């Protein structure tokens, strides 16, 4: 009995150590520890709580090593467990569930689990865990189109990481998120400054994958200013080195579309649709499908059907910024076809969506 307890304590300690390396963004060290832990998998499976803890951290490892490959099914194994109430495991369950929902673009669900996780943070009384929570929540807020709140949480996370040795990569990741929110706020100079700071940090540690994630964001920064050629230069580097990076593929396709390069745009759209179908990413499936219709110069009525399907999803997830963007594109299309009643209808829908975006970001 005592031997088993000691063995469980050692495994628990090893699992804690594994998670700490993930918090530090140390991929190679985390991979080595994963292999060491997998040698003890038969012992881990004997204990329900250890098995749940391992499954949670295994999901977190997948987020660390290839977050873009996370699908709706990636949490199935964890969902098969009975999750205890009011413990560090219940915190990790809701926290990681929120991360999973964010990555799979189920933002309403993500919000619910972030709220539950925040109430359980007391069971993990670690300052660095708070920083990790703030960082992940800032990503959610960014995707949820609340850039000011995202900046607040990214700043809180960065402050804690800065005060602890060995978290330089996390500081770089915070700078990356600060830059992203600055783009939403059209503070382009500040965004570029934050992105360059993040790249400097990642290059210092030879973190090529992280540099690529910032290159993607730089592409978006330049795309937001209609600097299509410059945007494509950064985005093509990402899509060449990470062919499954569907977000970079979409941004690159959209910039080629702006330049009237129909064939290149079409090729990228088909690649993106295949990837998004495989991983079940609903949001980007809509983005690619709408861009495909625009690239094919679909008639207004056909475009209307496709955009309305997207708007139904965007409204459900309260992504009103996209509802506004696509309603305005549809209004412009109807206007060009001299259908002024429909044009007026969709310009008005875009205006309503803009108001909802403003209300969502307003002080509560």
PLM regions with names:
Residues 35-42, 75-83, 115-126, 155-166, ...:
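Amphipathic alpha-helical segments of tetratricopeptide repeats
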Residues 6-10, 46-51, 85-92, 125-132, ...:
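Alpha-solenoid helical repeat architecture
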Residues 58-160:
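Long, mid-chain structured domain cores
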Residues 14-24, 55-66, 91-106, 132-145, ...:
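Tandem amphipathic alpha-helical repeat scaffolds
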Residues 151-221:
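Loop-centered beta-sheet repeat module
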Residues 1-97, 269, 306-309, 314-317, ...:
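Flexible inter-repeat linkers and adjacent short helices
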